[in-house]
């Protein structure tokens, strides 16, 4: 991002997350897409082509998507995993893994409390902070990647986890399962976009169009086990993936949760809260 803002890079295609797209649009860092070069856009599920971070997909197209949830060991956790509150259950002390990621960890806590994960209300944010400080003695570790090995080795009972990672873990250990709590979650999107610093906009659009070919989208999704927004790719995926309700939930996806939005200057308040939690 810093390189693009400084104009010192020649990237033609970038793959930002949804809240970064919103920020980059606000800073006029992205080209508008010429859909005359993107005829494969028709392959995308319409549920994903007009979301809050980029209305009418003027500057980006979705590449992969998924949810945040809880991956858990069915032998260690026998009750329903239907609420974020289970991450605060004292009987799992020392067996809970949380993400070392401020927006994700604070976000699911806000959802547990009934608030938006994009809140700018300091009272709500402080309530989430106190909940996470209270949870800290129960937490085995705050991780980003190494939690996966611990879940496979059955060293922990549960972990905050992205949906695609959960599917890979379940492939490695059949005792693991994935759940999306009923309070709602984060819907995330990785996207494809063209920065204004690109010197090859038309060629970049042709590459994005190539990535939206059903067989290419299916290969990418199958390899990393994250959901594809390409509706024509679903029939090319392994049946166990295409019919997995945690990878491909049906209906109105907005009922599952929220997309992270760019918080602007208020991001510093989340950073301060996260520092207080980690240092408590």
Show which residues each predicted segment covers.
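Early extracytoplasmic/lumenal segment of secretory-pathway proteins
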Residues: 1-23
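Ligand-binding "clamshell"
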Residues: 25-32, 54-58, 168-180, 242-244
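Short beta-strand->loop
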Residues: 31-42, 60, 174-186, 195-198
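Conserved C-terminal helix/tail region of periplasmic/extracytoplasmic solute-binding proteins
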Residues: 250-280
């Amino acid at each position: 991002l810093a390189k693009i803002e400084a104009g010192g890079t020649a990237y033609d295609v970038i793959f930002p997350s949804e809240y970064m797209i919103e920020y980059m649009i606000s800073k006029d860092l992205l080209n508008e897409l010429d859909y005359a070069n993107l005829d494969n856009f028709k392959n995308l599920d319409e549920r994903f082509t007009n979301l809050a971070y980029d209305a009418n997909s003027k500057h980006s197209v979705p590449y992969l998507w998924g949810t945040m949830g809880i991956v858990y060991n069915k032998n260690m956790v026998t009750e329903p995993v239907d609420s974020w509150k289970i991450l605060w259950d004292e009987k799992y002390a020392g067996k809970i893994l949380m993400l070392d990621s401020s927006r994700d960890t604070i976000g699911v806590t806000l959802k547990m409390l009934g608030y938006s994960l994009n809140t700018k209300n300091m009272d709500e944010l402080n309530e989430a902070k106190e909940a996470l400080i209270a949870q800290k003695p129960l937490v085995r570790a705050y991780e980003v990647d190494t939690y996966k090995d611990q879940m496979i080795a059955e060293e922990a009972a549960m972990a905050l986890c992205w949906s695609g990672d959960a599917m890979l873990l379940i492939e490695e250990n059949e005792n693991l399962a994935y759940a999306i709590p009923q309070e709602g979650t984060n819907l995330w999107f990785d996207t494809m976009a063209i920065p204004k610093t690109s010197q090859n906009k038309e060629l970049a659009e042709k590459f994005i169009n190539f990535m939206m070919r059903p067989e290419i989208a299916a290969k990418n999704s199958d390899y990393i086990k994250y959901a594809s927004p390409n509706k024509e790719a679903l029939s090319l995926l392994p049946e166990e993936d295409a019919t997995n309700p945690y990878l491909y939930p049906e209906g109105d996806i907005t009922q599952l949760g929220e997309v992270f939005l760019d918080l602007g200057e208020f991001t510093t308040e989340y950073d301060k809260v996260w520092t207080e939690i980690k240092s408590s």
